[in-house]
Every structure is written in structure tokens, then in C-alpha cells.
Amino acid sequence: MKNIILVKYLDADTKARRIETALAETRVDFQVNLEKQCVIVEGNSDMVAVARKVINDLGFMII
């Protein structure tokens, strides 16, 4: 199941790369969409929770 996490101020390649690098270290299947300022997570609610925590820990605000 696809889940969309909206990330406030995800408006630069460097920010997207920070998220990609951090999530790559997890088992989360994800895609960062810079144009729509979101992270698309494929998986169950546990995978979404992991992704949300990683994104929050990086200092990003989830909408």
C-alpha cells in the first residue's frame, strides 16, 4: 500500500538527498518527490512510522 508523507519546506535537492540518504539506511521502500514536497512510502503502517521518525529526526516538519 502506498502512503504519502507531506514534508513542509522540501524544496531543494540537498534536502531531498538528506532524506534519501537517511531512509536508505532503513528497510523502508520509498520515493522522494521534490515537486510535490512529499515522500511516498510503500508498505504497512510500521514502515510509515519508521519513515516519519527518520524525517522528523532530520528536523523536517511533516504536515
Stretches found by the model and what they are:
Residues 1, 33-36:
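Short glycine-enriched loop/turn motifs at secondary-structure junctions
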Residues 1-10:
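Short glycine-/aliphatic-rich beta-strand segments at the starts of folded cytosolic domains
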Residues 9-25:
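Short amphipathic alpha-helix segments
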Residues 31-32, 58-63:
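Conserved short beta-strand edge segments in small beta-sheet-based binding/regulatory domains
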